[in-house]
Each structure stands twice: as structure tokens, then as C-alpha cells.
Amino acid sequence: MKNNKPLILAIDTSCDDTSASVMNGQIILSNVIASQTQLHKQYGGVFPTVAKQAHKENIAPTINAAIKKAKISWENIDALAVTIGPGLAPALEVGINAITELAKEKNIPLIAVNHIEGHALSAIAKRNSKEIEKDSISYPVLSVVVSGGHTQFIYFEEIGKYKILGTTIDDAAGECLDKIGRMLNLGYPAGPTIEKFAKLGDEKKFKFPLPMTSIKSFDMSFSGLKTFARNYIQSLTEDKPLSKQDIYDFCASAQYSVFRHINYKLNKLIIDKPINEIWLGGGVAQNIYLRQTIRETIKNFEKNNPTKKITFRYPHTNRLCMDNAAMIGLVANFKFERSEFITDFESLERKPRWKIGTNH
């Protein structure tokens, strides 16, 4: 049943997943994802031209499936939304072309969305109206986005006005873990395998450094951990290959070091800034151990500051951590309320390096 919020059809083709969703305000009516993971396995990573062709093949059936699953018709749709960046330029182009054609054909308003804003808000997507009734946001909010392409601390006192307080200056956390996994021949993508193996290992077995402790900023760096891992693996395998237990221990130690770095900076942030809620988003937000470590950081802060309480949220389903269109429709809902529509379709361009909170 439609509430008084807009019905928005959103699509996301930012990387290697084609997704379409129908959102009724913050409520997910459908969230269809056509994954390309199997296609890119042979390359050990996302191959842009392959991704573009797969998006072209998947976009129309994915949109149709989202509308069908939501049990609505085109006449019900109040607005269209699309990711225009950041992401792979050839992939973004497919989504932009598809949605602008639909906007012209159906004469429906169009909203452009930043992919990272989607991850930043994904924790407040809802299953039904009861969840909204029971919920209220207490600002300021710090969104922690951890993915294969981005690792950022995003601060805001209202949705739509963001400030990046910290970001990785090189590799993202997810990329670092994937590359360490590749060094251990764990396949692609390696992140989920590292999490699985880490449960069987000793996280203190191999001592990784803690980066950027002498830097006052909240920025992060993961390239040093990746280099350290490569050199460590080379030294360990000089005489004999790694045993299964060695691999488990190395996965546990690598994962621990990456999340320790994030939490070290997060702890500095919550001491320094007024923060009432922390929202976790991005592909690595699926990692249960990451959620546990953030909970622990919050718990320790509250123990030392008894009058302060921080609410911790993360997406209610792992599908919202992946690249998906529901989070794009969620952002579009708030932009709809602010009347932030695209008036000139011809001027709509992909923005592969678009930073949240900026126009470029």
C-alpha cells in the first residue's frame, strides 16, 4: 500500500552489478540485482568493457523485474533515479542512457544520485511502514562507508549536507583485503573467503603495523598493509608453502589489522566530534567481524563517557551492502522532497570520481 511518499524507480550500474528498485519513500518494494561476478572471475577483477556489455543486456529485464515485483505500473511512478557517479565510466553510461530514454518516453521527473550517498544512507532503508513509525534519527550522524572502492567517514547534521571527515589516501579497505586474498590464491572476490577463513585462524599470529598513528587527521591508508602482507607472505614461503592453518591465521591477522586501523581512526573521531549515531554501509559492511569491532569501539567510548550514547545502525540485509538500486532510490526520495530534479537531460553526464558533498 502506497503511503504519502513518492514511488521512485531507481537503477544502479556503477560497477559490475545491474540493479533496479522501486522505493516508496524509505520502504523497499523491490530490489533486483543481476550480478556479473562469475563473468569477471576469469579476469581476477572487474573488466570495464565486459561490464558495459553485460549491463546493456541486463538493464531492461532488471527494470521490468523490479516493477513486476513491486506490483505497480508505470503510471504509478512519481520519479526516476540513476547513479551518475562515482564508478566505472562505461558502466555508468549504460544506466544514464537507459534512464534518460525512459524519462523522455514516459515524461517522468529524473533525479541524479551519488553512489556513495546511497551507501551512506543504506542503513535507514526499511521493510515496512511500522519500522518507520518506530524510528527517529538523532543527529549528528557519522556514516562509515567501507567498500572495495571507498573507505570514508561522512559527517552530517541533515540528509543532503555532508562533510567527509576522513578518507583513505590510497587503497580502500575492501580492495586491500581482496588483494591480500589474491596473494593467498583465494580467488575473486576474496573478501568473503577471508572472513570465512579468519574465523578459523588466530588474529594475533602475524603482527601487522597500525598505519598513520602519528597523523592527527582522520584519514586512513591501506597500501602499506598490502605491501607488508606481500613481503610477509614471500618470507613465509621461502622454504615451504603455507599450511592451511597458516592461511587461516594470515586471513585472521590481515582482517584484524585492516579493521583495527578503521576503528583506531573511528575512536579518535567519536572523541573529537559530537556524534549521536553511526551508520555502516558499503560492501564490507556485510562483514560480521567489522560490525562487532565497531560495536566494541562504541561500547568502550560509552564506558569512558557514561552520559553519552551512540546508536549503531547497519543495513537490515546484505543486499543493501552490495551495489544496489534500493539505496539509490532511498537517496532520491530525500532529493524528491527537496525538488532536486534534472531539468536538462542532455547535460546529464557520468561523474566517475564524484565526491559526496560536492558537484564534481
Language-model regions, residue ranges each:
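Conserved phosphate-binding catalytic cores of ATP/NTP-utilizing and phosphoryl-transfer enzymes
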Residues: 1-4, 113-141, 331
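A short helix-loop
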Residues: 2-8, 13-14, 21, 31, ...
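N-terminal beta-alpha supersecondary unit
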Residues: 5-76, 82-86, 115
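Phosphate/pyrophosphate-binding loops at sites that engage ATP/ADP/AMP, CoA/4′-phosphopantetheine
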Residues: 62-78, 131, 237-240, 265-276
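Glycine-rich beta-strand-to-loop/alpha-helix junction loops that act as flexible
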Residues: 82-86, 102, 147, 278-287
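Glycine-rich phosphate-binding loops at beta-strand->alpha-helix junctions
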Residues: 92, 275-297, 317
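Conserved phosphate-binding/catalytic loops in two-lobed NTP-binding clefts
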Residues: 112-113, 295-328, 342
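Glycine-rich phosphate-binding/hydrolytic loop that grips phosphoryl groups
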Residues: 119-122, 315-359
